[in-house]
Each structure stands twice: as C-alpha cells, then as structure tokens.
Amino acid sequence: MTKQELRQFIRQQKQQQPALDANAILLRLKQHPRITDSQTILLYCALPDEVPTLELLERLTAQGKTVLLPRVISDKEMELRRYTGRADLTEGAFGIMEPVGEPFLDYDSIDVAIIPGMAFDHEGHRLGRGKGYYDRFLSNVPYIYKIGVCFPWQLVDEVPTDEHDIRMDCVIS
C-alpha cells in the first residue's frame, strides 16, 4: 500500500469510528516517564481527527513545564513557540491553532516531542499528512525522544516509509 492509499484508508476508517474517548491515551501520556521527567516538551494542538491535547497542554503548563507548539511559517517550514495559554492561540495554517509570540530557538533544551500522525506502526514508523513539516524539523534534532500518539484504529501493521521519514521512539495509542 502506498502512503497516499494508506491516507485514504485511514480517512475512510475515521468515518466508521465512533467518537472515541481519548482519556486512556492521555493518561498513558501523562504517566510516561519521559513526560514526567521532562522540563521542555514539544506538543501539538489537535485537529479533529487527532488525539486532543488541550487538557494536557494546560496540565503540563500548570506543572511549570515549558510546552512548545509548532507554528507553520512557510510551505516547507515550521518553527516552535512557547504555549502560554489559550488566549495566545490563533488559527494558523490548515486550521490548526498556533501560538503567538517569539520563536523558541533553544532546541537543545527539548526533552521530548509528542507527535501526531494519520497512522503509525509498531516499529515507530509514522504516516503524516504528506507535507513533511515534522520530518524536516525532527531531522535537525535527532537526539529528542519522540512519542507518536494516535487512536488505536490508527495503529496499522506497516507504514510505507521513505529515506527521509523520521521514526518515533515509541507510540502510544
């Protein structure tokens, strides 16, 4: 199956899924040692078909952790900005809520990245939406521990990969 065929398959599966409760996934994330032991965490603002993260954003921020979110700045590039609260989010590219403020450039301080995807396999391979934003960013910071996060129906036997695709260190579903 090609990447495009798998994306289409996942879109069809999504339509057949009941509204899923993400609480168990979020609990596993909150309890993961890489999250509890980290000070600086890259997260994401969820699209409707992704595991919701707003509660996790608020919780981690309340714990005094630095939470970073991506902001798309061109067709090929994203940068990170610090999450400071819901009031400082604005709708950005692709309808994704993005933080305002100054770019965060201290990539060496990032302990863990929580990454969404359309599909993942048990080897940590990720199928994104086809734009390559995360793969390009993560290729520059290979030392960051990467956690893929998805609903159980997004976990598949095999994700087709290309040389530039970045593998997750673990997947939580």
For each feature predicted by the language model, list its residue ranges.
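Conserved phosphate- and dinucleotide-binding cores of soluble alpha/beta proteins
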Residues: 76-173
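N-terminal active-site beta-alpha-beta segment that forms phosphate/nucleotide-binding
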Residues: 1-108
